[in-house]
């Protein structure tokens, strides 16, 4: 592969993404080894760029209005193995190695732990670690 001349501006890969009016894109975190869906979070341009640069998931917290490095308080980082963009360019898929085996703030492996049974949402997956132990009690 040839190097590009220094004076040629390369297109920004972030420009290919269809961002929401708020400048966000939904991101799905998937276990790179077994395909389990771990969580969904939002990313802005900066968080997605940092995720690629640092090799660890960085999201945008809408409630806190700031960057959120996954695992910064729990230790349950997500190491980036692959990143994909869907056919409409409006959803990002992060294939990750989930450190500590817990992706959800409830202490479960996945945020998708509820299943619809007889018209009710019921918990289908166990708590691996008490969230108070992970984050401390209020």
Curated annotation (Swiss-Prot):
Q: Which residues cross the membrane?
A: none
Gene Ontology molecular functions = magnesium ion binding; phosphoribosyl-AMP cyclohydrolase activity; zinc ion binding
Keywords (A to Z) from UniProt: Amino-acid biosynthesis, Cytoplasm, Histidine biosynthesis, Hydrolase, Magnesium, Metal-binding, Zinc
Q: Which cofactor does it need?
A: Mg(2+); Zn(2+)
E.C. code: 3.5.4.19
Q: What is its main location?
A: cytoplasm
In which pathway is this protein known to take part?
Amino-acid biosynthesis; L-histidine biosynthesis; L-histidine from 5-phospho-alpha-D-ribose 1-diphosphate: step 3/9
Subcellular compartments: Cytoplasm
Pfam families of this UniProt entry? PRA-CH
What is one term from the GO cellular component aspect held by the record? cytoplasm
Q: Where does Zn(2+) bind?
A: 87, 104, 111
Q: Where is Mg(2+) bound in this sequence?
A: 86, 88, 90
Q: What is the top-level taxon of the source organism?
A: Bacteria
A GO biological process held by the record: L-histidine biosynthetic process
Q: Is Ribosomal protein included in the keywords of this UniProt record?
A: no
| Cofactor binding remark | Binds 1 Mg(2+) ion per subunit. Binds 1 zinc ion per subunit.
The chemistry this enzyme catalyses reads: 1-(5-phospho-beta-D-ribosyl)-5'-AMP + H2O = 1-(5-phospho-beta-D-ribosyl)-5-[(5-phospho-beta-D-ribosylamino)methylideneamino]imidazole-4-carboxamide
Family named by the database record: Belongs to the PRA-CH family.
Quaternary structure annotation from Swiss-Prot or TrEMBL: Homodimer.
| NCBIfam families referenced in this protein's UniProt entry, alphabetically | PRK00051.1
According to its UniProt entry, what is the function of this protein?
Catalyzes the hydrolysis of the adenine ring of phosphoribosyl-AMP.
**Mind telling me what this protein is named?**
Phosphoribosyl-AMP cyclohydrolase
């Amino acid at each position: 592969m040839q190097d590009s001349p220094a004076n040629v501006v390369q297109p920004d890969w972030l420009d290919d993404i269809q961002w929401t009016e708020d400048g966000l894109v939904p991101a799905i975190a998937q276990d790179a080894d077994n395909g389990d869906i771990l969580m969904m979070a939002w990313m802005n341009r900066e968080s997605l760029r940092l995720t690629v640069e640092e090799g660890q998931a960085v999201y945008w917290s809408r409630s806190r209005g700031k960057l959120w490095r996954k695992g910064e308080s729990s230790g349950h980082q997500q190491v980036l193995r692959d990143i994909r963009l869907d056919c409409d360019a409006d959803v990002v898929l992060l294939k990750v190695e989930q450190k500590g085996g817990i992706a959800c703030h409830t202490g479960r492996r996945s945020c998708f732990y509820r299943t619809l049974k007889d018209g009710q949402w019921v918990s289908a997956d166990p708590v691996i670690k008490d969230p108070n132990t992970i984050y401390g009690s209020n």
